Curated annotation (Swiss-Prot):
It comes from the Eukaryota. This is Maturase K. Usually encoded in the trnK tRNA gene intron. Probably assists in splicing its own and other chloroplast group II introns. Keywords: Chloroplast, mRNA processing, Plastid, RNA-binding, tRNA processing. Transmembrane segments: none annotated. GO terms for biological process: mRNA processing; RNA splicing; tRNA processing. Belongs to the intron maturase 2 family. MatK subfamily. It comes from Vicia faba.
């Protein structure tokens, strides 16, 4: 039972009081503003960032000190200057600042756990989105079945609050949290769906949602590691975290005594689990009936413990060689490369067919063009168009914006097996930039290029990444040629591009 007590200590260590004084500090909201400003570096900075000012924050903190604004007028949204519909901006500010405050102790807990596991040196590389793909390249080629699962969202915010209660024993924190959510549900909008809240309070919602994912994964990993002692159909008795460990100790004794000969759930050493955002990939080498067990495990886990409805038909188990899945803006599938080898032994000749599996990762050109069309860089057919909303900026700013988007897309999609789709995206952005400059100067594209000679200038910028590679390696070297053909994964990408379309 010592290992179970160690696992329990992880939950107890998070039962601490939060740093409430930080909620009343101006620099916390400055951090929230800076986070959102740096987060949207790919397209345009959209949201309340442009409205941010310390004067508004000071006014907000003053109203937070005056508790009568939160309580006395709780039944009249027109009189309530803090929670009223017209002042929804205050709600956004406080949710961002509050999310930063509550993230602090959990980040410290994460750092301490990484130090204990002695992986703190590689933590920065593990944070990179691209670190997932080398793992898939190493593992998926040896597996046979894959299940592409979308993690369902809770339909009510109270479910997320209840999940948080298992980890944090702090009554004032939950009073404030429920007050905030209740006022949002009552006054700010008539739409009670969780999707509306996630759009208007993005960082706060991500904090609650990440807790939900962390809770279900902690149960999944714990049961996965101890699965040789458990029957899958009996897992539902563990879901009351307060009595989790006592029940498990009792069940191990019961299984050892009465059910040792009927254990139907055993370890699968070749099962792999990968998750990012709201999607997870489950892959296995063995027969699909084990995958079916895990499928029903997830369904019952979400339905019985988290009150989240999920249908079995939404989780499909497919042969890896016949199925492609979308992850982090890429289409991935395992391609079979067949070759025939002629072998001769004495006077007998044999033809041996060799099958080599290779993970094929490509850029989904149609969804990406759809995202570019939504951002007004091209039409739905992929034909570049000008962006008049940027015409008020200087030529240098316009070019810098387009080049920033192009570089980031090229940086993100350099792991593609086929680069032709990436070259087409670069062409769309390049021509859209030229059309925007021509629109600003009230000229045609041909006349603008002839007059300013911008074609060579843009060409130099759009090939900057290739120039860097050529600087590191000689132009006639085989290494440079392989880098142009092969995939390159960058371990400094911490979040996906805003134009990346991930279903």
């Amino acid at each position: 039972m010592k290992e179970y007590k160690v696992y329990l200590e992880r939950a107890r260590s998070r039962q601490q009081h939060f740093l409430y004084p930080l909620i009343f500090r101006e620099y916390i909201y400055g951090l929230a503003y800076s986070h959102n400003l740096n987060r949207s570096i790919f397209v345009e900075n959209i949201g309340y960032d442009k409205k941010y000012s310390l004067l508004i924050v000071k006014r907000l903190i003053t109203r937070m000190y005056q508790q009568n604004h939160l309580i006395i007028w709780a039944n009249d949204s027109n009189k309530n200057p803090f929670w009223g519909y017209k002042n929804n901006y205050y709600s956004q500010i406080i949710s961002e600042g509050f999310a930063i405050v509550v993230e602090i102790p959990f980040f410290l807990q994460l750092s301490s756990s990484l130090e204990e596991e002695e992986i703190i040196k590689s933590y920065k590389n593990l944070r990179s989105i691209h670190s997932i793909f080398p793992f898939l390249e190493d593992k998926l080629t040896y597996l046979n079945y894959v299940s592409d699962i979308r993690i369902p969202y809770p339909i009510h915010l109270e479910i997320l609050v209840q999940i948080l209660r298992y980890w944090v024993k702090d009554a004032p924190f939950f009073h404030f949290l429920r007050l905030f959510l209740w006022n949002w549900n009552s006054f700010i909008t008539t739409k009670k769906s969780i999707s509306t809240f996630s759009k208007s309070h993005r960082r706060f919602f991500l904090f609650l949602y990440n807790f939900y994912v962390c809770e279900y994964e902690s149960i999944f990993v714990f049961l996965r590691n101890k699965s040789s002692h458990l029957r899958l159909k009996s897992f539902s008795v563990f879901f009351e975290r307060i009595f989790f460990y006592a029940k498990r100790e009792h069940l191990v004794k019961v299984f050892a005594k009465d059910f040792s000969y009927t254990l139907t759930f055993f370890k699968d050493p070749n099962i792999h689990y990968v998750r990012y955002q709201g999607k997870c990939i489950l892959a296995s080498k063995n027969a699909p009936f084990l995958m079916n067990k895990w499928k029903h495990f997830f369904i019952h886990l979400w339905q019985c413990f988290f009150d989240v409805w999920s249908q079995p038909r939404m989780i499909n188990i497919n042969p890896l060689s016949e199925h492609s899945f979308q992850l982090l803006g890429y289409f991935s599938n395992v391609r079979l490369n067949r070759s025939v080898v002629r072998s001769q032994m004495l006077q007998n000749t044999f033809l041996i067919e060799i099958v080599i599996k290779k993970l094929d990762i490509i850029v989904p050109i149609i969804p990406l063009i759809r995202s570019l069309a939504k951002a007004k860089f091209c039409n739905v057919l992929g034909q570049p168009i000008s962006k008049p909303v940027w015409a008020d900026s200087s030529d240098f700013d316009i070019i810098d914006r387009f080049l920033g988007i192009c570089r980031n897309l090229s940086h993100y999609y350099n792991g593609s097996s086929k680069k032709k789709s990436l070259y087409r995206i670069k062409y769309i952005l390049r021509l859209s930039c030229i059309k925007t400059l021509a629109c600003k100067h009230k000229s045609t594209v041909r006349a603008f290029l002839k007059r300013s000679g911008s074609e060579e200038f843009l060409q130099e910028f759009f090939t900057e990444e290739e120039e860097i590679l050529a600087f590191l390696f000689p132009r006639d070297s085989s290494t440079l040629q392989r880098l142009h053909r092969n995939r390159i994964w960058y371990l400094d990408i911490l979040f996906s591009n805003d134009l990346v379309h991930d279903e």
